[in-house]
């Protein structure tokens, strides 16, 4: 076989292997008829994502709380590792809910308000928690749920690693935005 043909075949096979199939990760047709929602994360997928997050946390000497929500805000799966205080569990839920409200990562929202006092005041009146650890769960370009992780300084890494392990490629993480030093305006 000519090298160019082998290369083309390898590219086609690799693309097919990395493609996501939404039907593997959402509720069944029967369940979707009852809920009138087709692209909702399945309980099985949510449990696998949670376990992947727990595995990441354990490997990195962390203890976390994890919430996976459906696009309508229903708890599909939740887990609190030993050693979590109530605030960690609550913030994990708030992060997942914030993703549903904003359709974006909580880190991206934190960046948006980092150096803008007016936005900080506006956002403080909304039911959002703009700090790292909440991500949309995206499959085939559709948000099928949200994950919120609380309890450590690598919450977003934990969530992202779990999502990419279980459902495949996800949107890139938001960059870190430097926060201006407090002090008088210049």
Placement of each model-derived feature along the sequence:
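Sec-dependent signal peptide recognition
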Residues: 2-10
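Hydrophobic h-region of N-terminal signal peptides that target proteins for export
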Residues: 10-19
């Amino acid at each position: 076989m000519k090298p160019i043909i082998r290369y083309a075949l390898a590219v086609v096979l690799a693309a097919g292997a990395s493609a996501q199939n939404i039907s593997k990760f959402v509720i069944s047709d029967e369940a979707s008829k009852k809920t009138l929602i087709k692209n909702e994360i399945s309980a099985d997928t949510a449990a696998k994502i949670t376990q992947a997050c727990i595995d990441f946390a354990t490997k990195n000497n962390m203890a976390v709380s994890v919430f996976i929500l459906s696009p309508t805000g229903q708890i599909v799966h939740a887990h609190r590792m030993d050693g979590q205080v109530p605030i960690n569990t609550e913030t994990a839920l708030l992060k997942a809910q914030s993703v549903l409200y904003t359709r974006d990562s909580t880190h991206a929202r934190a960046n948006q308000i980092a150096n803008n006092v007016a936005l900080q005041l506006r956002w403080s009146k909304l039911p959002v928690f703009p700090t790292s650890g909440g991500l949309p769960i995206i499959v085939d370009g559709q948000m099928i749920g949200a994950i919120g992780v609380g309890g450590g300084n690598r919450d977003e890494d934990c969530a992202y690693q779990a999502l990419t392990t279980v459902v495949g490629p996800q949107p890139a993480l938001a960059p870190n935005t430097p926060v201006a030093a407090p002090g008088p305006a210049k």
